Amino acid sequence: MGKYNLILSEYLSFIYNSQSAVQIPIYYSSNSELENRCIEFHSKCLENSKNGLSLKKLFVEYSDVMENATLLSILSYSYDKYNAVERKLVKYAKGKPLEADLTVNELDYENNKITSELFPTAEEYTDSLMDPAILTSLSSNLNAVMFWLEKHENDVAEKLKIYKRRLDLFTIVASTVNKYGVPRHNAKYRYEYEVMKDKPYYLVTWANSSIEMLMSVFSHEDYLIARELIVLSYSNRSTLAKLVSSPMSILVALVDINGTFITNEELELEFSNKYVRAIVPDQTFDELKQMLDNMRKAGLTDIPKMIQDWLVDCSIEKFPLMAKIYSWSFHVGFRKQKMLDAALDQLKTEYTEDVDDEMYREYTMLIRDEVVKMLEEPVKHDDHLLQDSELAGLLSMSSASNGESRQLKFGRKTIFSTKKNMHVMDDMANGRYTPGIIPPVNVDKPIPLGRRDVPGRRTRIIFILPYEYFIAQHAVVEKMLIYAKHTREYAEFYSQSNQLLSYGDVTRFLSNNSMVLYTDVSQWDSSQHNTQPFRKGIIMGLDMLANMTNDARVIQTLNLYKQTQINLMDSYVQIPDGNVIKKIQYGAVASGEKQTKAANSIANLALIKTVLSRISNKYSFATKIIRVDGDDNYAVLQFNTEVTEQMVQDVSNDVRETYARMNAKVKALVSTVGIEIAKRYIAGGKIFFRAGINLLNNEKRGQSTQWDQAAVLYSNYIVNRLRGFETDREFILTKIMQMTSVAITGSLRLFPSERVLTTNSTFKVFDSEDFIIEYGTTDDEVYIQRAFMSLSSQKSGIADEIAASSTFKNYVSRLSGQLLFSKNNIVSRGIALTEKAKLNSYAPISLEKRRAQISALLTMLQKPVTFKSSKITINDILRDIKPFFTVNEAHLPIQYQKFMPTLPDNVQYIIQCIGSRTYQIEDDGSKSAISRLISKYSVYKPSIEELYKVISLHENEIQLYLISLGIPKIDADTYVGSKIYSQDKYRILESYVCNLLSINYGCYQLFDFNSPDLEKLIRIPFKGKIPAVTFILHLYAKLEVINHAIKNGSWISLFCNYPKSEMIKLWKKMWNITSLRSPYTNANFFQD
């Protein structure tokens, strides 16, 4: 404890280093006597600082406070309006500033020209192509780096080398930024024309990326990669990341497998010591050579040399360097193009008549048959979800944009908003709601567009379709996904699997007589040639399905779905280009429909099947697996003979030729040992993930607060670290300090302490120890948690006003009325709350709530006020358990080989001792009988929180709850009267606790919690039949053991003697646990 507070104090002295600056620490304690001393101490500090006296004497006088109380926050003030950044920067700006090469990029605006050359006037200016979109500024980032450098200038040995490497790289950044002056951001952290006009347009986003890279430098190799990327990304804003990461798709095919993990029948990973040789035809080496040449042409030298050196013996031991280069390439930042170029990109492809109609026919038929297969059962059985598809759609309507701003009346309040949910309410109130009519998206009503930016790829456009499209597609797509959930081919949706399962699936069938074909079909998904056969296949499937039922409502659902496909075959988009809005006929498939993911997966599966059926005319092989995962598909083919170089080359060329016959511009590769797809890559029998999450640049702006973004920053840092890209932790902590500080006045600022930011309260931002989620059980921790709970949710006047309007009330009661067969307060209140929560995405409401939250927080950070809360948190439960455990030292041998080489050592060690898990632990209650019963008769999906509440009610209340949702009385009676109900109580509690303990997030998702090796370290004598208590005791013990191992690299064993009398008490408490949402949990969820 306390590392953060120490750095915080040093950081404040670094930033406010003038005479007038003062730091006042604020302490608190759960002990009332000590708490009084804390209050005295604080008021005397304020008194002294007002009179300009030193605080040193007070620190001595109140040493009891400083030793025994807990730091709550630091109040800091300084009269210096600090343009200190510029002053400090000069010290580092000793090098030669970079000069941008203005001819590197094809599109003029992607060259790093002076802003006024790209945008001659303020009216033409837009920051949308370089907006870092993050609530922290370049000056803060520079400060954070300079703080680190100053703190470490006296390091020795290996640490000194790191310091020198980073200093050298920072000199490049500082000199370049200093040449033009540090761009000042406005209150919204944006960079305006006045600031940018005489500076290079991409200066800010480049500097942010460069800082992120240089603060991730440790070794000499890191330094070489970073230097090259920093220097080149200053000029090349378009293709650098793609150039650097391209070779990976071939590199994975060059490494022999010598021992690997495979999936066994029980879907667990098990070690197999098979040897598979990498068989690589010359053609592949030629392609790789071409890629390296392209890199050199673009000015890269060190990176291609590293790859070249590795090629000498292609060893898996040195492969992590290749993985590192691949990950680093993404940290050059997002490629943000103009919308017009993004749209035209897909329309440029030449349409040729010279295509294989037979293959297209087969492709369309496969799509048709798959759609039929997916929906056949629900349609034949007149599934209630397909009957009540409209209601289901309304219940899960998002609060995203509906594409146009409208003026809406809620009671006496008139607002204008683009949000779907508000438009639906307004339309219903005014009799304009017609879900049975799908509006056209033709030349008269072109589709407005959103965008998706990603490093190393072009900007993609997203359709923002009217909400009728969502309602028409929702129910059908949900049914498709349910089918995909138990179909192994759909790697992305397959039931509770994680990426390790997909890894074992590939390695399972690799051998000397098989090869794996992997294809990136992202180009095909958005190509014009895809759209006709794609939509027609879906339409034909829907027509066949409509003949399988006589239910008018199901037929209506299918027809509306069909109508969305028909409309989209004639689609136009609107693109703002300067002041004009261009209408362009857009013939390709874009994201934005509800069906995007499901339908793309269907199409990609159909595509690879079409190609394989062609190839099988020429070769004799068995298809061992076919998988599709997002934009990628792959298949393992097993031949009767050993694979030779000639075979690999022939198959490879035939596959490419087959794709070419459909005019599909795709990257198809064949290998014997590894694959590379967007989500993961397998090389030498080991699995790797790309650690490419940008920290200091964001894709887009949302309505999250600085606190939220600080939590997301930390969460991104953790994910990158697990994947092998480590950024200096002190730097991350410094960013968190900057982003969580609260300004009181111009010169007064409050910085929360570690305790505030790491206790699991509604304000939690990060973990005091990476990878370990701690639930504080000391008096002070529980005290502060209670204090924060008292100010958890803030009211918003606007939201209350909208919620009180008849428009809103009628909407909610219409939903309840359609859903419920009898009164059910839990559900009605749930719907009302959900709808009210959706209003949060309307900016004025979130702003209002944020202001209230900040002012409450300010009060709290200066003096915590507790209230006697009846709420119980998971901390209280663990606090009750803790005293009954005794700890002993233990020993666990390493017994599993490494298969994820990029993991940090301490996490790797645990997997090597207890093994890994290939499944997600169920934490949403969907496996419980009650959840299944509800989904059998109703479109309503209760959350885990609601199930947890309901299952602990009296039996007759549960019956009423079920009956009101349309479950027949006989089923409800049977349920409550059976054993299943008591199993459900346990099951749902278990899910709920797993959910609270974030078992499926961070590094916990990698560990096998049911490992016998882990079990044997825990001894809990069995007393009485309270499975829920036994469960929580075991889970707590496992987490304690694992956390200790992460921290210390050694094992402990736990013995628990839990008194039977306490068990009943604990069991009762366990039914009143409150769940806490925090920026931290939201960030975890956001990762998903």
Curated annotation (Swiss-Prot):
Residue ranges of coiled coil: none
Intracellular or extracellular location(s): Virion
Superkingdom per UniProt: Viruses
SUPFAM superfamilies documented for this protein: DNA/RNA polymerases
Reactions accelerated catalytically: RNA(n) + a ribonucleoside 5'-triphosphate = RNA(n+1) + diphosphate
UniProt KW keywords: Magnesium, Nucleotide-binding, Nucleotidyltransferase, RNA-binding, RNA-directed RNA polymerase, Transferase, Viral RNA replication, Virion
Keyword RNA-binding applies: yes
GTP-binding found in the keyword field: no
InterPro entries with a match to the protein in the record: DNA/RNA_pol_sf, RNA-dir_pol_4-hel_dom, RNA-dir_pol_luteovirus, RNA-dir_pol_reovirus, Rotavirus_VP1_C
Family under the similarity heading: Belongs to the reoviridae RNA-directed RNA polymerase family.
Ranges for domain RdRp catalytic: 501-687
Reported cofactor(s): Mg(2+)
Lineage: Viruses, Riboviria, Orthornavirae, Duplornaviricota, Resentoviricetes
Annotated Gene3D superfamilies: 1.10.357.80, 1.20.120.1390, 3.30.230.140, 3.30.70.2480, Viral RNA-directed RNA polymerase, 4-helical domain
GO molecular function, one term: nucleotide binding
Gene Ontology annotations of biological process type: DNA-templated transcription; viral genome replication
E.C. designation(s): 2.7.7.48
Record text on subunit structure and interactions: Interacts with VP3 (Potential). Interacts with VP2; this interaction activates VP1. Interacts with NSP5; this interaction is probably necessary for the formation of functional virus factories. Interacts with NSP2; this interaction is weak.
GO cellular component: virion component
Function: RNA-directed RNA polymerase that is involved in both transcription and genome replication. Together with VP3 capping enzyme, forms an enzyme complex positioned near the channels situated at each of the five-fold vertices of the core. Following infection, the outermost layer of the virus is lost, leaving a double-layered particle (DLP) made up of the core and VP6 shell. VP1 then catalyzes the transcription of fully conservative plus-strand genomic RNAs that are extruded through the DLP's channels into the cytoplasm where they function as mRNAs for translation of viral proteins.
Name of this chain's protein: RNA-directed RNA polymerase
